[in-house]
Amino acid sequence: MTQTPIRLLIAASGTGGHLFPALAVAEQLLDYKIEWLGVPNRLEQTLVPQDYPLHTIAVEGFQTGFSLKSVKILLGLFSSVFQVRKLLRERKIDIVFTTGGYIASPAILAARLEGIPVILHESNYLPGKVTRFFSRWCQTVALGFEGSSQYFPNVETVWVSTPVRAQFLTPQPLDLPLEEDAFLIVVVGGSQGAVAVNQLVRQCALKWLEKGAYIVHLTGDRDPEADSFKHPHYFSLPFYENMAGLLQRANLAISRAGAGTLTELAITQTPAILIPYPYAAEDHQTYNGKVFADAGAAYLYSQKDLTPQLLEKVVLDLLNSPAKLQEMAEKTGKLAVADSAKRLADLVRNHTLLAEVSQK
């Protein structure tokens, strides 16, 4: 007799920081029947494999204070909860896993109303408002940073770090024309790019290139000046699919401080100069970056304080300090949790079993 597979709904949407950890967990649950909940016209439309049926609902972030827009958003939430409840029933979902963000609220509420267990993963050190508010209706909140438990005094939490995709765990070939022993600087602004960081780097790049460095600059697709700087050893790309191979080869990264990117830096033991996105909700990227800076794994600078002159000097100093870079790489590696995806998948499996037992 063939056993019916467990049916899992993954609610993850918007940015790589929400999607990549969810995809990593899905890779660990090959025996589950997985379906995906997202938002129309977002990154999940291209990243989520066709093996996972993608369902979309319209949902917006909450507004503080009372206004017509906040009333509209609240009514939209009620509508989206109704849609998700219908989906949970029709698809006979057994358990829900979400990585937070706007999509988490209707997913958690609908699952709660249907008596379906929910596992919520929060990758940032400072949990988002949605996570903090809706965590009370989840079976467990899995944490990307160990210190984040302080924000959940009345909720069961477990530290698992943040999962990375499987390719980060094995050596990956790189198809870029780089000299074998050349110093490689990788500039990455996250899945949405970072125009301000791009401008800073272009003002400094020539000095670094003159010292023999190569630069791979991932600009994102929203930078109108992306092609304004040219040099044989400078590669400007909107995105690069093989991030695992790129960071494994990198000697230094200049990056935002999103939780997903930091996890990839830790797994690949890549020293970094971190420039938190200044408009991130509640400045959460600064909290993330501070963990790495305090551990000696990265330098942390606010965007408003980082001048081209300072960035140029810091990188040149590191170019001339291989011992310092090695020390930073080792400290970065100590922050890595290679089996994070398995830990989260095991959490999903355990709560699936608990739910089955409670129903008998």
From Swiss-Prot:
Name of the coding gene? murG
Write out the pathway annotation from the protein's UniProt entry. Answer: Cell wall biogenesis; peptidoglycan biosynthesis
Its localization reads: Cell inner membrane
Q: Name one molecular function that GO assigns to this entry.
A: UDP-N-acetyl-D-glucosamine:N-acetylmuramoyl-L-alanyl-D-glutamyl-meso-2,6-diaminopimelyl-D-alanyl-D-alanine-diphosphoundecaprenol 4-beta-N-acetylglucosaminlytransferase activity
Q: Which HAMAP family match?
A: MurG
A GO biological process held by the record = carbohydrate metabolic process
Listed A to Z, the keywords are: Cell cycle, Cell division, Cell inner membrane, Cell membrane, Cell shape, Cell wall biogenesis/degradation, Glycosyltransferase, Membrane, Peptidoglycan synthesis, Transferase
Q: Which family does it belong to?
A: Belongs to the glycosyltransferase 28 family. MurG subfamily.
Please name the NCBIfam families in this protein's record.
murG (TIGR01133)
Look up the EC number in the record and give it.
2.4.1.227
Q: What does this protein do?
A: Cell wall formation. Catalyzes the transfer of a GlcNAc subunit on undecaprenyl-pyrophosphoryl-MurNAc-pentapeptide (lipid intermediate I) to form undecaprenyl-pyrophosphoryl-MurNAc-(pentapeptide)GlcNAc (lipid intermediate II).
Query: What membrane topology does this protein have?
Result: Peripheral membrane protein
- Enzyme class name: transferase
Q: Which residues bind UDP-N-acetyl-alpha-D-glucosamine?
A: T15, G16, G17, N124, R165, S191, Q285
Which InterPro entries does UniProt cross-reference here?
GlcNAc_MurG, Glyco_trans_28_C, GlycoTrans_28_N
What reaction does this enzyme carry out catalytically?
Answer: di-trans,octa-cis-undecaprenyl diphospho-N-acetyl-alpha-D-muramoyl-L-alanyl-D-glutamyl-meso-2,6-diaminopimeloyl-D-alanyl-D-alanine + UDP-N-acetyl-alpha-D-glucosamine = di-trans,octa-cis-undecaprenyl diphospho-[N-acetyl-alpha-D-glucosaminyl-(1->4)]-N-acetyl-alpha-D-muramoyl-L-alanyl-D-glutamyl-meso-2,6-diaminopimeloyl-D-alanyl-D-alanine + UDP + H(+)
GO cellular component: a single term: plasma membrane
Q: What name does UniProt use for this protein?
A: UDP-N-acetylglucosamine--N-acetylmuramyl-(pentapeptide) pyrophosphoryl-undecaprenol N-acetylglucosamine transferase
Please indicate if the UniProt record lists Transmembrane helix as a keyword: no
